[in-house]
Amino acid sequence: MLTLSKGASFRPHYAVLKLPHLHKKWMAYIHDPYPFHYYPRPYNWVEPGYDFKELFFKELSQKAKYSAFPSQLLKEWMSSYFPDFSKTGIVIPHQNEKYEVQNTSFPSYFDISKFNLLHAGNLMKQRSPEGLLKGFILFLENNPSAKEDAKLILLGDASYHTEMLKQYNIPEIYIHNGNKAFDEVYHLQKNVSVNIILEAKGEISPFLPAKFPHCVEADKTILSLAPYYSETRRLLGEDYPFWSEVDDVKKIASLIGKLYQLWKQNPDSLILSRKDLESYVSVTHLKEVMKSLNNNQ
């Protein structure tokens, strides 16, 4: 029996916790830190009734046969608060499901012949794109000719950063502060030069971004802007060259410059080419994980 969580709701977990006869076959999936005050900085949420939620999760960690997490770092993070998770925890990353884009036409703001960098996804208060924007501007200053063929595209709700974003109203940057159709974004991810994964500034980011499997499938170079200790960086590898702290403007500019030079030499050279990650986020891997649990019973 698998119980899933959504947002701040763990109601299915709470319900099964009250049914002891199901505990021996129960897998509790935990998608994010909980209670919310266990989020790493810069997140600083404290919910009403947090003490009750701590007791609830302590009991859950002790009673569920298995606990499942989308990332290794999240499993370790939650185990530091509830040690039983280290015994019962397994990692089930977000998977890719085969999907055919219905609308294959490109939007007016996208020119496939350009050096396009895309960040797709909501920019929460803690995920500021300012370092990326400053880094891109510095890249343009260092490479004046790039103004003819480079474009940074930001798609997704960024209401916390609206005023700051107004400062970057230039032709080389396209910002859509709001939602776009999945088809449109998914199609762009597969056709841009670089996909950007931007995370909050902090000491650690134990989350596996939901778009990570899409970026892996797109097979385009990923520019990872994340803490040194992050699940994205862990999966890409310590030696992955296109990683920077989210606010290191000079390094971001330098990395974009290197990517731009590679693109100028051969626009088709900016591929991710990570069969190991494609396998990791596949349904086949999920089946292998579940089979191993059955074999260990």
Can you annotate each of these PLM segments?
Residues 73, 94-95:
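Carbohydrate-associated surface elements
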Residues 108-127, 133-136:
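Conserved donor-binding/catalytic core segment of Leloir-type glycosyltransferases
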Residues 59-89:
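A short, active-site helix/loop in glycosyltransferases that binds the activated sugar's phosphate group
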Residues 147-156, 160-186:
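Nucleotide-activated donor-binding/catalytic signature segment of Leloir-type glycosyltransferases, i.e.
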Residues 127, 181-187, 195-214, 223-234:
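Nucleotide-sugar-dependent
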Residues 11, 34, 47-67:
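Membrane-proximal helix-turn-helix segments that form the acceptor-binding/catalytic region
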Residues 1-23, 28-31, 36, 244:
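An aromatic- and histidine-rich active-site surface loop
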Residues 246-254, 261-296:
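A charged, aromatic-enriched C-terminal amphipathic alpha-helix characteristic of glycosyltransferases
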